[in-house]
């Protein structure tokens, strides 16, 4: 009886450890690819003299500085998109929350808030507003292309 209990406990622990390992490994791979992508983007901006990144301390300081810039920016854009979706659900008949006008308003509000709330506070990152508009616009178009307005697949009626 105790042997079976320990065997089941070990099996559950082993299964949990395998799932946790896969989760951590996939997260590490994602963060590595994200880091390489952002490193490549920063090199492109520097090469074409569209951006200047002057914060250069230790690896962990750089990771914290530039990482917080990206995370705070993502939070702002995420919050604006969800707020705009909430407004669209609450006001479905409003012309501003349909079609291209909705996407233009979402993009404009997200870009403006990112610039004034996040970007201006990071003095070691110098990127012009129009470059930020192009980058966020490209990301917004990719989001619309790869994640279209889909239905909730969990609602079974």
From Swiss-Prot:
The chain crosses the membrane at residues 18-38, 63-83, 100-120, 122-142. InterPro entries: SepA. GO terms for cellular component: plasma membrane. It is found in: Cell membrane. Belongs to the multidrug resistance efflux pump SepA family. Involved in multidrug efflux. This is Multidrug resistance efflux pump SepA.
